[in-house]
């Protein structure tokens, strides 16, 4: 698909469905993959599945000291991060008028502020090497909004604006910054939806099915590869036509 042999990638949120799929696809293309997450058992299971060329980097992204240490450890243990995939994210849904400050704060902290801090840590070294790929996994919700998710949508829209600005700042250093925005993707969470709930979702998707983690991961692999060397500041939407942007 996209040749990544010898490239070193750090994938945050690799213990989740999309993050795990991204790690698998990058690894299959020859990359050495650093797996970040908070669910240690899932990370270890994924590492066992992948075999060699894998390193684990557990960290709590809500803790700024752990975020800084994550960047430093990944740089040291991987001997330089060539590909940074900011995929980790959380939700704390609720109607705006009932949303508590802590629910706003933690979503912005993990989804947006931790991404800023980790990217800053890694980018400093990418600039020194004059090479790098930064891919931020946002969401269709960041582009079109979603009731009950003002905090989540704000964080994901923020990632898109962040990526466009950073892309302009570091393009001359041979570093690209792009986003992948998934729509409804098959996961343990969507598996719990009943038939009526799934039917309602399908009406909004012209392709009439949910996407797979591998389809999202394939877009990430493209942006990480030399095939996308002339692509920066862009968002690839993987949503089955749910939002044609």
From Swiss-Prot:
The active site is at 152 (proton acceptor). Substrate binds at residue 139. Pfam families: adh_short_C2. One of its GO terms (biological process) is fatty acid biosynthetic process. One of its GO terms (molecular function) is 3-oxoacyl-[acyl-carrier-protein] reductase (NADPH) activity. Keywords: NAD, Nodulation, Oxidoreductase, Plasmid. NAD(+) binds at residues 11-35. PROSITE patterns: ADH_SHORT. Proposed to modify Nod factor fatty acyl chain. PANTHER family: 3-OXOACYL-(ACYL-CARRIER-PROTEIN) REDUCTASE, 3-OXOACYL-[ACYL-CARRIER-PROTEIN] REDUCTASE FABG. NCBIfam families: 3oxo_ACP_reduc, PRK12826.1-2, PRK12936.1. Belongs to the short-chain dehydrogenases/reductases (SDR) family. This is Nodulation protein G. It comes from Rhizobium meliloti (strain 1021) (Ensifer meliloti). The gene is nodG.
């Amino acid at each position: 698909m996209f040749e990544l042999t010898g490239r070193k990638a750090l994938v945050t949120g690799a213990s989740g469905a999309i993050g795990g799929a991204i790690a698998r696809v990058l690894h299959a293309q020859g990359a050495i993959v650093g797996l970040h997450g908070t669910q240690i058992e899932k990370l270890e299971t994924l590492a066992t599945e992948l075999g060699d060329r894998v390193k684990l980097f557990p960290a709590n992204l809500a803790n700024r000291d752990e975020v800084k240490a994550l960047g430093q450890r990944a740089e040291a243990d991987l001997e330089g991060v060539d590909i940074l995939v900011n995929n980790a994210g959380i939700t704390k849904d609720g109607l705006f008028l009932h949303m508590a400050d802590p629910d706003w704060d933690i979503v912005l902290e993990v989804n947006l502020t931790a991404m800023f801090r980790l990217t800053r840590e890694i980018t400093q070294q990418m600039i020194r090497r004059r090479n790098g790929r930064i891919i931020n996994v946002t969401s269709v919700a960041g582009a079109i909004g979603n009731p009950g998710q003002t905090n989540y949508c704000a964080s994901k829209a923020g990632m898109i604006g962040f990526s466009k600005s950073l892309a302009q700042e570091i393009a001359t250093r041979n570093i690209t910054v792009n986003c992948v925005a998934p729509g409804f993707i098959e996961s343990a969470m969507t598996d719990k939806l009943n038939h009526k709930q799934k039917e309602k979702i399908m009406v909004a998707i012209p392709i009439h099915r949910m996407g797979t983690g591998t389809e999202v991961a394939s877009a990430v692999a493209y942006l990480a590869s030399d095939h996308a060397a002339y692509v920066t500041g862009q968002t690839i939407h993987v949503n089955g036509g749910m939002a044609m942007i």
